[in-house]
Amino acid sequence: WYDGLLSEWNNETAVQLGPDNYDTIGGWRIYEVTCDDPGLSKPAFLSSKLVEAPNAEEAAALDRYVERFVWGGLQCTEQEPYPYGIYGIPDWHVLRNSKDEDVRGKLHIWRIYDYPHIALMYYNLYRMRRLYPALPLSQSAETYLIRAARTLIAMFTIPLELDDWSAFGTGLYNELAAEDILKALEKESMPDLRLRLERLWNRK
């Protein structure tokens, strides 16, 4: 289930961290390996790096992460009840298979902090598609941009609906990507999506 995960290497123990071996991470903190800020900052960083310094092997790894780990796993697809929702801790596999049908299980998609990391990743994938069309990426530039915008829209709407957690009053890592995403939506002639995101962003 975690095929494509961007893993970390523990230099001290020479172990690659993953759901089959959390190494020195124990208890509830195992989330650090796959999700939350520790897990989701890695694709945000790698995608930002690839815009400035493209590398085909790294782009392929990021693409595998998106196609096999994020879309339909970590993040809800457009065919699910809450499109673009992002699963929280301990990991999406546990939550999707939970017997709890509510916000502590299958609807644990209310953590506002998770959304900007993934939105930034998609925005950078959009830029990579535009700047370096030869890189091995599975989706179109338009698809990545739409996902970036709709991930931010989901950040403002899904947590508020499910758990009364508002993204309007808290500063979030990587949320300033919204400014660039709005400019890109205007450039790509997506006025309806731009207006919807702009209303939410301006309110904040």
Residue ranges and their predicted role:
Residues 1-204:
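Catalytic cores of extracellular degradative/oxidative enzymes
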